[in-house]
Amino acid sequence: GKTADDPFVVNAKNVTTTTLDYVVTPKDDNVQYVVQTTGMDMYNTWCNEGENNGDVFQHFVTFWKAMGNMYGETWQQQIKYDAKKGTYDSEVDYNTQKTLLWDADQVIITFGVTKDGELVTPIQTTKVRTLAPVPSDNKIKLTLKTNAWRNVVITADVSNSDKYIVNVQSAAAADAHIQSGDLVKWLLNSGTDYSN
């Protein structure tokens, strides 16, 4: 129902086209919780992957199981690496969410969970929308200087000081995304930080 019933107060801040920070304060200071931000598309994937049947918590359990298998721990022991207590500020923790798709819905997922893996609050989702890019009349002329294996050098001559991105990819990697129309989404989800 109502925001007053939510177990956490979640506020987004420093929202840009591709980044955001957030502050989470549990209404019960004794609750250990996990918070994760992702795009709405990814959230929907997490809810519906495998046998999750709409339960995003199962995505986290699957992740913790995989990590536990790698490090010789149970999935419940893995929770401590993600768990928070008290007020959490992603900016203060140097954990700004980056590489988000611009002008798109993002979700801050927050839930209380015990060290034994028992869900103790409803899963709270807080929607935030990243900003739309500001159109630019910047004219960019690219010149290929070096075209060698793992050594591609390009110079860019620009007509103004507006920010821009140059991202060199092999045709083999990019062609499928160009054809499917999701090139920008693929580039942003590649792990490259475009916040500056």
For the regions a language model picked out, list residue spans one by one.
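An aromatic-rich alpha-helical recognition segment common to small helix-rich domains
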Residues: 24, 108-110, 156
